[in-house]
A protein has these predicted regions:
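Long, C-terminal-biased catalytic regions of enzyme "large/alpha" subunits
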Residues: 1-89
Length: 89
């Protein structure tokens, strides 16, 4: 799968970038424990599954970010989702 970046450049999809962005948002609010890291890794995996189910060849950054927000909120990480949203703006 490929990603269409904000500047229009096409890049290979890298799930670790999603995970790192979520961690950055989380560490503004919480101390990153192993349990929290594992839970956020599961959120990342669910986003990857959502993307695979969407069957798009080239996902946009905004599509991926919306999926991340949805999964964070669904997992009860409301504060992390708020910081993730502000981080991406």
């Amino acid at each position: 799968m490929q990603v269409i970046k904000r500047d229009g450049e096409i890049a290979e999809f890298n799930p670790d970038k999603i995970y790192q962005a979520i961690l950055k948002a989380a560490q503004t609010v919480y101390v990153l424990t192993d349990d929290l890291r594992q839970n956020l890794a599961q959120v990342t995996k669910k986003v990857v599954l959502d993307l695979e189910e969407a069957k798009v060849e080239r996902a946009t950054i905004s599509m991926i970010q919306s999926m991340v927000e949805h999964r964070l909120l669904g997992a009860g990480y409301i504060t992390i989702a708020e910081h993730y949203i502000s981080y991406r703006l």
